[in-house]
Amino acid sequence: MAERTVKPQRRALVNRTTNETKIQISLSLDGGYVTVPESIFKDKKYDDATQVTSSQVISINTGVGFLDHMIHALAKHGGWSLIVECIGDLHIDDHHTTEDVGIALGDAVKEALAYRGVKRFGSGFAPLDEALSRAVVDLSNRPFAVVELGLKREKIGDLSCEMIPHFLESFAQAAHITMHVDCLRGFNDHHRAESAFKALAVAIKESISSNGTNDVPSTKGVLF
């Protein structure tokens, strides 16, 4: 089975449409400029989850503010450029939007990845004040997620706390990665969740970085 080699720009454009959500994602795992062919929004949206620098373009619009904030943190600290647009059935609740964005983002990561010459394994710790989280990732083609955040509140902003681990689980399943994310301590749920996403960003960034070879990091000789 052919394996793709690490290249300067690893990119994906994903469109996902169901009866519940319409999603468009443009991703570059290595930063740089990204755009979408045509926005799904009739009127262009900008919010606090938009950040443009010399090395990254990040614009997250899911309609769920705290979800935007978490994906923004994931992209920023992972070194990605990322545009996420979603129109979802938020008149029902936040479930379909959160789950489907996780699936679409996982699809984008899987499509963008190169599998030769990557480290494959990555780990990261991230503190946010009193909160400390750990994430460990394996680009394994064995989709599995263990997420223990210990959140106590019903919601953070307009995002149900039960949907935060579900987003991460949906992402891992679609990206075909093994992922363990744990919040080790902390009493502020906002801090606990955000430190977890930042730790995951650090872990993924390490796992997809070059190992200095052109080899597939597996005894099987293949990953995906």
UniProtKB/Swiss-Prot annotation:
Keyword terms of this UniProt record: Amino-acid biosynthesis, Histidine biosynthesis, Lyase
Transmembrane stretches, start-end: none
GO biological process terms on file: L-histidine biosynthetic process
Annotated CDD domains: IGPD (cd07914)
Reactions accelerated catalytically: D-erythro-1-(imidazol-4-yl)glycerol 3-phosphate = 3-(imidazol-4-yl)-2-oxopropyl phosphate + H2O
One GO MF term attached to the UniProt entry: imidazoleglycerol-phosphate dehydratase activity
EC annotation from Swiss-Prot or TrEMBL: 4.2.1.19
A Pfam match: IGPD
Disulfide bonds: none
Pathway: Amino-acid biosynthesis; L-histidine biosynthesis; L-histidine from 5-phospho-alpha-D-ribose 1-diphosphate: step 6/9
Similarity annotation: Belongs to the imidazoleglycerol-phosphate dehydratase family.
Protein name: Imidazoleglycerol-phosphate dehydratase
Source organism of the structure: Cyberlindnera jadinii
